Amino acid sequence: MRRIKANRWVVLAVLFLFSLLHQADRLLIGPLTTSIMNAFNINEAQMGAALSGALLVGGVLFPVWGYLFDRYSRPRLIALAAAIWGATTWFSAISPSYGWFVTTRASTGVDDASYPGVYSLLADYFLPRIRGRIYALLKLAIPLGYILGATLATILGTRLGWRNVFRFTGASGLILAILILIFVRDVPRGATEPGFKDLIEIKGARFSWTTARGLLKRKTLVALYAQGFFAVFPINVVTFWLFRYLEVERGYEGGFLLGIMAITVLSLGAGLQVGGALGDWLFQKNLRGGRLLAGAGTIIGVVLLIMALFTSRENALMFSILVAVGAFFAAFVSPNVGATISDISLPEVRSTSLAIQSLIETTGTALAPLVARLLAARSDLRTAFIIIIVCATVLWLPCYGIALANVSSDVEQTRAELLSRKDHY
């Protein structure tokens, strides 16, 4: 256990760097879209196909990665994911034609589905009482990666061209693969769970299909899987279409527009940290605490975002404040849901459980912008935002209620089963 304590912060730092640079690589294609379209002389529909390919491949492979992470060495698989990221991004950089580019960009989705293993490994390095904060810190890589990707695309893209930007981020993936192999070590699954944390040596539990199928018998998990589909709609619709909404329907431009985007992204990052910390604190007081906090944050965020949409174009300051604060509260959900899934899932199937959640959320993430575009075609983006936010919340709340009603007993059941194994090690 002493070795785990000594190494865990180094492991977290390396995995955070992996997540940060990987998210930057995933998100910088947005700012580089125009340059890529000009290079291959393609239209928006063709570019959309290139973007959708990676999402589709990643979604299909979530269960595969989850299974592999539960069966084999997690650090080696994460290093493999980093190497795949580097290689596929490099191939994208040297694509001679549009067809080749679509294929290579789709292949970048292979490594996008590797995050369940990252969270599973960290769950075995850090105690349950601080899992929310650890997950929140790792998820901070998403908004920071967005900023880093935009910065790289703006600074390097204009000077070096989009191909060299991809070469740079591809090389980063290969370097990260080496760092992961050097600094990250696997630990026994369940090493930090109550009843096991004081043991020096633990024989890891083995994956079994019976245990994996048992995930669907936990009411809390099923409810969290279902809510994950609806919960991602509002934040992904707003994130995907916010720039165009601000530019076209509200008439904002230049530095002010970029300022709103930056503040919103930073608010998301801050909300992740506060939500994770408060969720951990309440979880120690009451097993339902983290979930209560996540639900409250989502509801507050929804109300504030809708209020922002009803502000006048001239009241830009109030609009900016409401969007930023709404994003802050909406971010409370993510680390708490992830921590709850980890607390309920047995260690030997934790990656599989997280992969199921990721698959469902990815499906919602892919559909949300399309639904918004279809609604906007009949009215406008503002109306589409309001309809999607309200409908998603109405569908999400019952799932939240079911999870809230069962989370305490499900966590206690998992802990009891783990304690019953203690005498066997």
Write out the residue ranges for each language-model feature:
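Cytoplasmic helix-loop-helix junction between adjacent transmembrane helices
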Residues: 104-143
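C-terminal transmembrane helical hairpin of 12-TM major facilitator-type secondary transporters
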Residues: 291-336
